Amino acid sequence: MPFGVKNAPAVFQRKMDNCFKGTEDFIAVYIDDILVFPENEREHGQHLTKMLEICQENGLILSPTKLKIAVREIEFLGAILGNSKIKLQPHIIKKIAEYKEEDLTTKKGLRSWLGILNYARNYIPNLGRLLSPLYSKTSPTGEKRMNEQDWKLIRKIKGLVQNLPDLEVPPENCFIILETDGCMEGWGAVCKW
């Protein structure tokens, strides 16, 4: 499939989903990332064998330099997964915290920073509501000039990002409660157990 085609990611994801159909209990696929997650080492060998068979049957080529086998922690979609924890990758934290203030004075720079902040959204409660004054700066009708409150907010967010808590994976066989809420200003949810 050629690069740059608008629907290419969706078509490729559908192809990968079809290839790995029936393995959802132990294999997660996102575009070209394949994550095998067993309960123990014995299962890991079985699941890897199954994954390799599927790749071979479907002509999928794996890069030996990108393979990580039998590791307890893995980087996946901007997070570090392992030991029943989910942490934001340090390079993303650094990029958010060290984003230059002069770049935040432009609409393009502010949008870019807000986009990177989406990686931290799961770690900071009510982040959307907290950032609403900055989002209004990127709208066609909003006030464009940054004021002292905006800079205080940016410094606060940068501080929060540098001290993020680790998220925890729910224990096996626990009851999970999903609390949701919505209003005119936004919506949100939290998973409790």
Model-found features: residue ranges?
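Retroelement reverse transcriptase polymerase core
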Residues: 1-193
